[in-house]
Structure formats: C-alpha cells, structure tokens
Amino acid sequence: MTVEMSVDRSSFDEVMVPCYNPMEFIPVKGFGSRIWDQQGHEYIDFAGGIAVSCLGHCHPVMVQALTTQANKLWHLSNVMTNEPALRLAKKLTQVSFAEKVFFANSGAEANEAALKLARRYAADVYGPEKSEIIAFNQGFHGRTFFTVSVGGQATYSDGFGPKPGDIVHLPYNDLAALQAQISDRTCAVMMEPLQGEGGIVSPSAEFVQAVRELCDKHNALLIFDEVQTGNGRTGDFYAYQGIGVTPDILATAKSLGGGFPIGAMLTTAKIAEHMKVGVHGSTYGGNPLACAVAEAVVDFVAQPEILAGVKQREQWMRAELEKINQKYQLFKEIRGKGLLLGAALNDEWQGRARDILVAAGKQGLMVLVAGASVVRFTPSLIISQQEIEEGMARLDKAIATLM
C-alpha cells in the first residue's frame, strides 16, 4: 500500500529540474472555479491551468467520463484502436473542417505532427526543395526542438545548438513582409489565429484572409495552431470559424481534455493520405482514458448555449477590467477574444505583469502573464458572473498593494 509522503514547496527545489518557478502555495483540491491550498486558503481561478480547465476543476461530466472508462480499459497503444478514440475523432470532424484526425498527448506533439505532415505533403507532391516554413515573431508552438524553433521567441529556442533549417520568422500582422517572403518554395505558413504567449495579439481580418490567399497562390499549406484558442475559448468552437478563414491543418490540445492530457492534429483526407503507416506515431496518442474525457468535453462545450455564454462572459470580464482601469489607469488596452483576454500594461507599468500575478495570488486570485507587460486571463468557460466579480475585486485589492 502506498504511504502518502509529506511534501511542501521546498520539495520542488529539492527534487525537480528547475525549468519552472512555481508559486509558493501548493493547490491540493479544486472544484469549479475555485481551488484550495495545503493550508486551506481558497483561490478563484482566472488562469485555468493556462487555458486548459475549460469546465473548471473536477466537473461532474468529466469525472463521470473518466471514472466510467477507468473501469473498462486504460491503454492499448496504436497497434489496436479503441472506441473512445474513434468516437472522439468522429466528433472532431463534425465540429470542424477536418476529415482526418491524429491523436497525441499535448499541443507541442500536435504541432510537431502538423509540421511533419506539411513537410511530407510538400515533398511528395512538389518535391524536396519545397520545404520553407514561415512563422511569426513572438509565436509559440511548443517545446519540442522543431516546434520551439518554429515559434518566434529566441528566449525559448536559443542555447540548444543548431536548429532545424528552412524556418523563417516574420512580424505578425505584417502583410508586406509576408508578400515579400512567400514563394513556391514555401511549404507552409504556421500561425496562431490569436497570439497567446506573444501578448494576446489578434490579427486583422485582412491579414488572415491575405495569408490564406497567398498560401493558395503558392501551393503552401496554412497551419493554424489552435492549442490555446480552440475548444470554445474564443466563443467559437475553433477560432478560425470566427474569422472566416479555414486552415489546411489545425492543432488542438489544452482545453480539449479539460485538464486530462491530450492533443490532436486535424486535417483533410487529401493531405492526411501522405502520412502513411510508420511515418509518424505516438504510443499514448488516442489513449482511451484521455479520449473518453475529451469526448465528454467536446459534447459539453459544443452546445450553442455554452459558446454563447463564453461571449457573454467576455463582456463581464471586460466591464470589470474597465472599472479597475478607471480607478488605477494602468492598462493601455484590453486585448483578446472570448475568455482569452490580456490586459496590456501602460508605459508606467511596463515589465510589471508578474508583480501583479504575485500580488493577485496573495489576495486569493490566480492569473497569468503573456510576456512581461500583459496580464492574461483564461478562466473556465462556465465561470459564474459572481465569481468573475469576486475575482476582479481581489485583483483590485492586489493592484492597490502595488500603487
């Protein structure tokens, strides 16, 4: 029988690789949009595990799906398929443009699969010289060597030796730069339909439409990284549906499992046929436990009233942030869409987003940052208006301590 060992925050420094700098408190229980730490302190969660906990913590629909599947079948590998994976794949094709699905364990793996597929497709159809990948500065696509190199942030990609080649980074939303770079050598353009880690930056409608047209002109694939924006986060099931531009390949993860690790790459049958047996794979991809939970999440989030509710909650969040800004005048703008929002700090507050995050934690509120000067909010898609107002009151108190 396993004996539960006593651990605290100092245990992290003792035994964990120092990739992270976690908060001083350790959550031990969560329900809905609230969590409690080892000392019993309660927090309202506006972070959602970085846009993951779309139904909050321990939602009964997810708990039931996991419990039921846990009593049936845990793992097979892809030597065999399984019912939850097939049902989930069917449902993902029903809520998107896709005809084919590849399952992985994370957003990074989904993006890795997307990039490999794009390169494979281009080589098969047009020849090996068509290999250039265009991505954008301040983008973020994961931490594998390929995806972190495609992501346009040197902080994450430098220091590991030679990078994968034929990757070009351009300014986001800069159509002239894209027009000057894209050519018949371009294999794919990869972008977030709303940059998350890069500061919650939305593209213009004209830019996204032009990207699609330029990709078509040069026979390049358009890859949308919807790891953070997907599964209802923006008020559409996928963000591309709200901007009227359909990609060729889409990567999804985070909210897909609502907290249970899963990722997926979605594409068309024509493109997918180039990923033949043995070309790519994942031992855990399509795991029955993960797919059972994700199926429950998709069923819940895809309801029209849930998606409409995300848009309503965006308005509640914006109204409360405007109240705070009228009082303290520290935000220059509120960015984003749905429940992927960022409060960009003004010149006087530049670089102090983490100060606000830490102060908020001391007041019982969990928030995120998106760079040094943007406070990010990615709460549950079904957080109540009362919890939004209460959380914002705690944010108000936190900011007051920094004035």
Curated annotation (Swiss-Prot):
Record's signal peptide: none
Subcellular location: Cytoplasm
Binding, N(2)-acetyl-L-ornithine: 143, 282
A GO CC annotation given for this chain: cytoplasm
GO-annotated biological processes: L-arginine biosynthetic process
E.C. numbers: 2.6.1.11
Pathway(s) the chain acts in: Amino-acid biosynthesis; L-arginine biosynthesis; N(2)-acetyl-L-ornithine from L-glutamate: step 4/4
Reaction equation(s) it catalyzes: N(2)-acetyl-L-ornithine + 2-oxoglutarate = N-acetyl-L-glutamate 5-semialdehyde + L-glutamate
PROSITE patterns for this protein: AA_TRANSFER_CLASS_3
Keywords: Amino-acid biosynthesis, Aminotransferase, Arginine biosynthesis, Cytoplasm, Pyridoxal phosphate, Transferase
Cofactor note text: Binds 1 pyridoxal phosphate per subunit.
Cofactor dependency: pyridoxal 5'-phosphate
Binding residues annotated for pyridoxal 5'-phosphate, in chain numbering: 107-108, 140, 225-228, 283
Family named by the database record: Belongs to the class-III pyridoxal-phosphate-dependent aminotransferase family. ArgD subfamily.
NCBIfam families: arg_catab_astC (TIGR03246), argD (TIGR00707), PRK01278.1 (NF002325), PRK05093.1 (NF003468), PRK12381.1 (NF009047)
Entry-linked HAMAP family: ArgD_aminotrans_3 (MF_01107)
PANTHER family, A to Z: AMINOTRANSFERASE CLASS III, SUCCINYLORNITHINE TRANSAMINASE
Assembly mode: Homodimer.
General remark: May also have succinyldiaminopimelate aminotransferase activity, thus carrying out the corresponding step in lysine biosynthesis.
Name used for this protein in its record: Acetylornithine aminotransferase
Natural source organism: Vibrio cholerae serotype O1 (strain ATCC 39315 / El Tor Inaba N16961)
